[in-house]
Amino acid sequence: MHELSIAQSLLALIEDEMAKHGKEKLITVKVRHGRLSSVVPEALSMAFEVMTADSRLAGAALVMEETPVLLRCRDCSREFTPDPPTAAFAPCPGCGQELGHTVVSGRELYIEYLELE
């Protein structure tokens, strides 16, 4: 369950930002994760809740939003969402090429915003 280490990293980043801005309370953290990032949202949410339970971050809301996969064809440069949406080797709807696509989005994992007091 690598979500535990992801939660630890998120909490370290959150604590750094809180210190940087002189804030004492975390209200909400929004995390954006790509469909190909291998993050299990329920596991990350549970890890976040457990790790913040007895801290000043207890009760903070973790909002997660998934970014869909977007590929760019290496042959015709068309951008498309594969079907199924987790397929990295899908035929390009423009030219039919199946291999060598560039992942434009879908692998990211980052904090989009923090709501602090």
From Swiss-Prot:
Q: Does the keyword Zinc apply?
A: yes
Q: Where does Ni(2+) bind?
A: H2
Write out the residues that bind Zn(2+).
Answer: C73, C76, C92, C95
Q: Which UniProt keywords apply?
A: Metal-binding, Nickel, Zinc
Q: Name one GO biological process term.
A: protein modification process
Matches recorded under InterPro entries: Hydgase_Ni_incorp_HypA/HybF_CS, HypA/HybF
* GO MF, any single term: nickel cation binding
Function of the protein: Involved in the maturation of [NiFe] hydrogenases. Required for nickel insertion into the metal center of the hydrogenase.
The record's section on PANTHER family has: HYDROGENASE MATURATION FACTOR HYPA (PTHR34535:SF3)
Family membership, please give it: Belongs to the HypA/HybF family.
User: What name has this protein been given in UniProt?
Assistant: Hydrogenase maturation factor HypA
| UniProt organism field | Solidesulfovibrio magneticus (strain ATCC 700980 / DSM 13731 / RS-1)
